[in-house]
């Protein structure tokens, strides 16, 4: 009688069998997901605001995803094309906004600088008045007169003189690039080039993940906001990353950060690097250091208007290391400047290095696709070794 009480119906047996099979499938999928996860190189992009992190991500899309044709995951060519068209339209608006912000910022700064800057041609004052009048207009529709006034002002020597003093106020890096292209951007059929899209500045808020594959190896790159109030979100990304790519705007030695208009940008980057290098949660994660904006650094050094020693007095005593390898045709002043900045970061990493993580510096220009291709190829072996060490396979 007891046996009869424990007997199972056919339906119950079938249900249990189905449950066991479902559990097996779930377990198998979990194992598969774990293998994929362990085989993926996760790279965390860190750095102070406007250092070029998002531009590095754009380069990965150009080099390893599908350019700017959608996000690179669509199997349907029509869907990819539709996504691409939508993205390009959004980017055209972003580029026009960059152009507007650039001319507004420069003409607004003219009267605020000490000493102030005058227009070379006083007859252009009505153009300045127009630009300032549309400064806060929501959903601005970019009428022809906007481009006419912006172009005339950009050709005014007084406006150019104010632009030359842009380290004294907050101006986006791409200002000159887009102001030089007003005649192209104003066209109704304007389609941005890859270089236009690389130069376009949009504030990164939150965390963005880009997935790509190089020689059948999966990479996930996380780009996070660089402004101070974004940094508290970073800690979510720290868990189990293969490496940190720390991006520095090398040309920012004579600029101050947007957040307080006081702290030197390069000093802010050094302080941030130090806090990351010494963070107890990151003591085993190595850092690939991208000393970025080498093109702008070279321009500043050769122009000779802003001397590094005025901001970092120790530069006056610095000599270029014997093992320095300048680019072909590089001016010795540029070589000395870029190695000084490199060594400021290496001083931090060597002062508190305990052999559990390392710093690998590279000189980069994020808007130069070939430069980023070469640098990333150089980094891949390092990343692979970090990954093997992470899972104790090395």
From Swiss-Prot:
Coiled-coil stretches: none
GO molecular function, one term: D1 dopamine receptor binding
Region feature (G3 motif): 219-228
Per UniProt, location of the Glycyl lysine isopeptide (Lys-Gly) (interchain with G-Cter in ubiquitin) cross-link in this chain: 300
Region annotation (G1 motif) ranges: 42-55
Residues modified to Phosphoserine: 352
Region described as Disordered: spans on this chain: 1-23, 68-91
UniProt biased composition (Basic and acidic residues): 8-23
Region (G4 motif): 288-295
SMART domains: G_alpha
Region (G2 motif): 196-204
Region span, G5 motif: 364-369
Any one Pfam family match given in the protein's UniProt record, by short name: G-alpha
Recorded consequence of changing residue 258 to W: In AHO; defective GDP binding resulting in increased thermolability and decreased activation
Residues the entry annotates as binding Mg(2+): 54, 204
GO terms of biological process kind: activation of adenylate cyclase activity; adenylate cyclase-activating adrenergic receptor signaling pathway; adenylate cyclase-activating dopamine receptor signaling pathway; adenylate cyclase-activating G protein-coupled receptor signaling pathway; bone development; cellular response to catecholamine stimulus; cellular response to glucagon stimulus; cellular response to prostaglandin E stimulus
Result, substituting residue 388 to R: In PHP1C; significantly reduces receptor-mediated activation; displays normal receptor-independent activation
Family per record: Belongs to the G-alpha family. G(s) subfamily.
Disorder cited: Albright hereditary osteodystrophy: A disorder characterized by short stature, obesity, round facies, brachydactyly and subcutaneous calcification. It is often associated with pseudohypoparathyoidism, hypocalcemia and elevated PTH levels. Pseudohypoparathyroidism 1A: A disorder characterized by end-organ resistance to parathyroid hormone, hypocalcemia and hyperphosphatemia. It is commonly associated with Albright hereditary osteodystrophy whose features are short stature, obesity, round facies, short metacarpals and ectopic calcification.
The protein's name: Guanine nucleotide-binding protein G(s) subunit alpha isoforms short
Annotated source species: Homo sapiens (Human)
Gene: GNAS
